[in-house]
């Protein structure tokens, strides 16, 4: 996946939280030079973040061969990053509340870029995993804070537009990271591929630092563990939020598992695809640029529950197509699966804001935590099924998760309609 969650923003609540002054509140409006600087900075940050996070996914077979590890062990290079990102989300959001948005994001992106460059020098598998863990932990500082910065600084009338550009950067970054690493690995080596992506991300971090305006509406708050715990308990006692968290876990777990191991399958007989062609399969992600807004329009007409269930079913249909031996059917299945995932995920994530009674930012962080935890756990477990049962085993594992997502989504719709 490489896409960031689309979270509902309540502009009114942001405005009310601003300090009272005798001067009118100045937000950044569309069409101004500052708006262009903000959108360019956040777009490039989102692109770099998800390129760094997912660049290893298409080269998992290469890492398996070079370091002599199993597919399940190779997938840990991605799972450990998403797992540490999930854990970091619980801390970097509150940290940015205390010390500032821009400082956290700039530091996070620079650290992740440097760790990616260092990973190209590692000669042991454990060294690779340490670097990948640090990359995931660092990137949580961008994932947790980017949307908060936009909701604080952009005029409420243009928040949705700027958020859309930011999310586009995330999705394009996830695709380009996979695409570049696959192609460069095929023509050069995986070390050169990661070095190129690391240098690009470092340049993005420097540009981000230079052009992103300082926060005007940020007010530092002290870290209060007691308040965080009270809100945490409130969210888990809600009749809908825990089901949404579980839905995010299952959807992302299914998505990452399919793309982790489809490359292994297609590099075998009878297809024998090259590493570059496996990387090119990430263009399937582009279906999300159509399906996500389509899901939003359908939600306004039919409601969140039915639309989420429909697109989860689309994922299941796409998965079934990948079980055939025709390459065209497999790719069609990947297109359907990706379209269904991005649409279902956007509906689930947009449900968080309206459901949370307070501390909506923390509720969104808990959703993202569950989302990336699903990527980490399911992405690794899929390797066990691949090793023991081949693609049919992986497909069965994903099908179980999607059926569970349908059951959870059905109960969610029944409870909240």
Predicted regions and their residues:
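Paired small-residue
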Residues: 111, 115, 126-134, 328-336
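Cytoplasmic helix-loop-helix junction between adjacent transmembrane helices
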Residues: 131-172
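C-terminal transmembrane helical hairpin of 12-TM major facilitator-type secondary transporters
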Residues: 305-348
């Amino acid at each position: 996946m490489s896409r960031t969650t689309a979270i509902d923003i309540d502009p009114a609540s942001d405005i009310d939280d601003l300090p009272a002054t005798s001067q009118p509140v100045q937000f950044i409006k569309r069409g101004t030079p500052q708006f262009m600087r903000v959108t360019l900075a956040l777009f490039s940050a989102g692109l770099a973040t998800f390129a760094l996070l997912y660049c290893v996914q298409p080269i998992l077979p290469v890492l398996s061969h070079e370091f002599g590890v199993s597919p399940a062990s190779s997938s840990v290079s991605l799972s450990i990053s998403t797992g540490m990102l999930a854990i970091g989300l619980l801390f970097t959001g509150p940290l940015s509340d205390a010390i500032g948005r821009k400082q956290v994001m700039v530091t996070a992106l620079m650290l992740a870029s440097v760790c990616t460059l260092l990973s190209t020098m590692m000669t042991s598998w454990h060294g690779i995993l340490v670097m990948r863990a640090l990359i995931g932990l660092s990137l949580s500082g961008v994932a947790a804070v980017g949307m908060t910065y936009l909701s604080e600084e952009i005029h409420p009338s243009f928040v949705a537009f700027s958020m859309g550009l930011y999310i586009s950067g995330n999705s394009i970054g996830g695709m380009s990271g996979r695409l570049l690493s696959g192609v460069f690995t095929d023509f050069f080596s995986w070390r050169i591929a990661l070095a190129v992506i690391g240098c690009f991300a470092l340049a993005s971090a420097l540009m981000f630092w230079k052009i992103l305006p300082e926060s005007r509406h940020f007010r530092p708050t002290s870290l209060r563990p007691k308040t965080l715990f009270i809100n945490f308990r409130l969210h888990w006692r809600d009749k809908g939020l825990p089901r949404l968290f579980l839905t995010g876990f299952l959807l992302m777990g299914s998505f990452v598992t399919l793309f982790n191991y489809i490359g292994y399958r297609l590099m075998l007989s009878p297809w024998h695809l090259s590493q570059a062609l496996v990387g090119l399969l990430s263009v399937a992600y582009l279906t999300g640029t159509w399906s996500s807004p389509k899901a939003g329009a359908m939600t306004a007409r039919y409601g969140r529950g039915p639309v989420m269930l429909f697109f989860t079913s689309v994922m299941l249909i796409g998965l079934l197509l990948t079980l055939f031996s025709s390459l065209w059917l497999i790719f069609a299945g990947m297109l359907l699966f990706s379209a269904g995932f991005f649409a279902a995920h956007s509906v689930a994530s947009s449900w968080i804001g309206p459901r949370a009674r307070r501390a909506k930012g923390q509720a969104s962080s808990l959703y993202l935590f569950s989302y990336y935890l699903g990527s980490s756990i399911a992405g690794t477990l899929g390797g066990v099924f691949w090793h023991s049962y081949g693609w049919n085993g992986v497909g069965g594992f994903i099908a179980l998760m999607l059926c569970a997502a349908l059951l959870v989504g059905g109960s969610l719709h029944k409870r909240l309609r």
